[in-house]
């Protein structure tokens, strides 16, 4: 299992557009990928799950991946987070 912590700097947090991009990125991988926020973990491949967390600016989240391509998945998600100005 691999995991990485992120501090959300985007003014709007993880709203619909970046959430969609994160879900699309995560869905490219076979690994199980979760987003943890305030003690609640959701499947990062589920737009409803990600949106239900209401992650705002200044939040600290952890993304974890478990599976054969976990490291590649985390690297791609980190790239998306950076490219979209989320973290």
From Swiss-Prot:
| Predominant place of localization | cytoplasm
Q: Which Gene3D superfamilies match?
A: HPr-like
Per the record's keyword annotation, is Membrane included, yes or no? no
Single GO biological process annotation from the record? phosphoenolpyruvate-dependent sugar phosphotransferase system
| Regulation: induction | Transcription of ptsH appears to be regulated in response to sugars supplied, i.e. is four-fold lower when cells were grown on lactose than when grown on glucose.
- Please provide the record's keywords in A-Z order: Cytoplasm, Phosphoprotein, Phosphotransferase system, Sugar transport, Transcription, Transcription regulation, Transport
Q: What is this protein called?
A: Phosphocarrier protein HPr
Q: Which organism is it from?
A: Streptococcus equinus
